[in-house]
Amino acid sequence: MLVHTDYLWFNTKKRQEFVRITDEIAAIVKTSGVAEGMVLVSAMHITAGVFVNDWEDGLIHDFQEWLEKLAPAGLDYRHHQTGEDNADAHLKRTIMGHQVTLPITAGKLDLGPWEQVFYAEFDGQRRKRVVVKVMGE
């Protein structure tokens, strides 16, 4: 079995931001030499996530509004009693998930016609990374 590991780095301009990373993942898969297998894409920070969905501006906006209703910024969360101020980011990351596993077929990502991979930042404006681990034959 072949295993190839790479990293994507992010430093978003906004506190909350969704970044489409499908092309970057596809490029890593291509250079890995894996023809049949899977790729794990995992955010390596507790206030960031990775998810798969449609790349449509209205839907991205809907996600942001929905998450803000579920875990509003600025509330007096217990986590803030420890000196932190980002409990909402932890909650949003938990809702959206921190990793995805994607199929590789014939050396390419095997996604549905509308599926795209996103990095979700919920406490941004600092350097963070995503691990991309390609495994297979």
Predicted regions and their residues:
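Active-site histidine-anchored catalytic micro-motif
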Residues: 1-137
